[in-house]
Amino acid sequence: MWESICLTLAATAGNNIGKVLQKKGTIILPPLSLKLKVLRAYAENKPWALGFLMDIVGALLMLRALSLAPVSVVQPVSGCGLAILSVFSHFYLKEVMNVFDWIGITVAGIGTIGVGAGGEEQEASLISVFQLLWLALVVAILFVLLNAWLHIFKRQRREQELGEYEVVEEIIYGLESGILFGMASVVSKMGFVFVEQGFSTMFIPMCISISICCSGTGFFYQTRGLKHGRAIVVSTCAAVASIVTGVVAGMFALGEKLPTSPSGRLLLLLGWLLIMLGVVLLVTSSRLIRHLPRSFRRSRQTSLERGFNIRRTTSHTPKDTNPSAVIQAATLHHLLSSPSKDKD
C-alpha cells in the first residue's frame, strides 16, 4: 500500500512541477504549432523539455500506482499534488506563502499518512457489466442535468445583461471537470482489473485511451470555467469532485471496499477528509487570509519567513503583505490549466 502511495505522490509531483516548468519555459517561446522551427525551439528550451519529460514520467508512475492500489486510495492521495506544487513554488519560484498555505500542506500530509495507515491490500473483484452500464448512465444523466442547469443560468444572465459569471455557473464547470478527472482514474484502473480477470491485454490501452479522452474533456470544462469565472470556486469544486468521484465510482464499479478493521476504516475516512480539507485550504488561502487582522497577518508572515529562511529582496516591503499583491502558490496550478492565460 505504501509503495502505491509513494508512486502516486511522485506521479502527482511530476505532473504538477512539470507543468510549472513548461509554463516557465513558454514565456520566451512562440505559440505552439506544428511548424518544425517552433517544435525545435520548444525541444531546445531546457525548462520546457524538462517539464514535459517530468509530466510524461508522472503519468507513467500514476498508471503504475493504479495497477497496484484501489482508485479509492490513489485518487485522494493525488490531491496532495497541490501541496507538493506549493512547496516547490515557494522554494524554487520564491513565491510567498501565507499561514493557510502551510496549514493546508500539513493537513494534506497528515491525511496521506492516514490513508496509507488505514488502507488495505485488496483482491481484484469481478466487474459487473450491469454496474458499469449503471455508472455510465448515472454520469450521463448527471451531465445532462448540470448542462441544463448551466444553460438556464446563462440565458438568465443574457436576459439581465449581466457581464460576470454567476457563482452557480462556476460551480457547475468545476463539478463537471472534477467528475471527469475522477472517472479518468477509474477507467484506467478498470483496464488493469480486466487483465487480472483473464481478459485480453488490449483492454489496458483501450481503457487508457478512454481515460485520456475523459481528462481532455475535463480540462476543456475547467478551462471554460477559469476563463471567465473565479479560479477559487472552479478549482475547489473540481478538486473535491475529483476525489469524491474516484472514491464512489471505484467502490461502486470496481468493487473496492473499506478496510475490515474499525481502526483502519476510521483512519482511511479521516485521511480522505483531511486531504480534501487541505486541498480546499490551499485553493482558498488567498481569500481566507484577508479575513485575518492586518497585524496578525504581518506577524505570522514574519515568523514563517524566519523559520524557513526566506530571502526577501528590497521589493518585499510591508506593503506587499497584502496577499493580492503576489501570485499565491495554491492558485498557480489552476492558472496553468487555462491555455488562454499563457499570453499575458
Curated annotation (Swiss-Prot):
Query: InterPro entries from the xrefs?
Result: Mg_trans_NIPA
- Cellular location(s): Cell membrane; Early endosome
Q: Which organism is it from?
A: Arabidopsis thaliana (Mouse-ear cress)
Which superkingdom heads the taxonomic lineage of this protein's source?
A: Eukaryota
Which GO biological-process labels does this protein carry? magnesium ion transport
Query: What GO cellular-component annotations does this UniProt entry give?
Result: early endosome; plasma membrane
Q: What is the name listed in the Swiss-Prot or TrEMBL entry for this protein?
A: Probable magnesium transporter NIPA9
Query: Which of UniProt's keywords are assigned here?
Result: Cell membrane, Endosome, Ion transport, Magnesium, Membrane, Transmembrane, Transmembrane helix, Transport
Q: Which residues lie on this side of the membrane: Cytoplasmic?
A: 1-46, 89-98, 147-166, 213-231, 287-344
Record lineage: Eukaryota, Viridiplantae, Streptophyta, Embryophyta, Tracheophyta
PANTHER family, per the entry: MAGNESIUM TRANSPORTER NIPA9-RELATED (PTHR12570:SF65), PTHR12570
Chief subcellular location: membrane
Query: Any idea which GO molecular function terms this record carries?
Result: magnesium ion transmembrane transporter activity
- Signal peptide positions on this chain: none
**Transmembrane segments annotated in the record for this chain:** 47-67, 68-88, 99-119, 126-146, 167-187, 192-212, 232-252, 266-286
Q: According to its UniProt record, which protein family does this protein belong to?
A: Belongs to the NIPA (TC 2.A.7) family.
Membrane topology is:
Multi-pass membrane protein
Extracellular-side positions? 120-125, 188-191, 253-265
Ion transport recorded as keyword: yes
Q: Does the keyword Membrane apply?
A: yes
- Cited function: Acts as a Mg(2+) transporter. Can also transport other divalent cations such as Fe(2+), Sr(2+), Ba(2+), Mn(2+) and Co(2+) but to a much less extent than Mg(2+).
